[in-house]
UniProtKB/Swiss-Prot annotation:
N-acetylalanine modified-residue sites: A2
PANTHER family found in the cross-reference section: PROTEIN PHOSPHATASE 1 INHIBITOR POTENTIATED BY PROTEIN KINASE C, PROTEIN PHOSPHATASE 1 REGULATORY SUBUNIT 14B
Cellular component, GO annotation: cytoplasm
Keyword Hydrolase among record annotations: no
Region (Disordered): 1-55
Gene designation: PPP1R14B
InterPro entries hit by this protein: CPI-17, CPI-17_sf
Molecular-function GO terms, alphabetical: protein serine/threonine phosphatase inhibitor activity
Name of the protein: Protein phosphatase 1 regulatory subunit 14B
Gene Ontology BP annotations: innate immune response
Protein family membership: Belongs to the PP1 inhibitor family.
Keyword Cytoplasm: yes
Native species: Sus scrofa (Pig)
Low complexity: bias regions: 1-15
Amino acid sequence: MADSGPAGGAALAAPAPGPGSGGAGPRVYFQSPPGAAGEGPGGADDEGPVRRQGKVTVKYDRKELRKRLNLEEWILEQLTRLYDCQEEEIPELEIDVDELLDMESDDTRAARVKELLVDCYKPTEAFISGLLDKIRGMQKLSTPQKK
């Protein structure tokens, strides 16, 4: 497996900014190991670990990632309505879009989602129909695209 950061540093995820703060989401920082370059001429500073922002790159199409992110946000919004609760209180369930895309037909996809929502007391047909409409034409993100 590849190193988690430059010079053997550990990757740290900063918490996501709160809603309405205008932030772009969580940021990834790399913590430099003691004595690493960039800590000053005297070696380790007394101020604790040095945090520098790292860039994360992937080989996925940016447009496809944006569609996936929008879909995941829509799913969370719909689940909070279906379960009539806050996002943190939604029962543990995972709607795997790639798994749904692997299935042969909309009927099998609908059956799988209905199976996942078995504990929901509200009608789920509109959610399932909307989900199937939104994933139609999407690409799987399990494997990076070759360039």
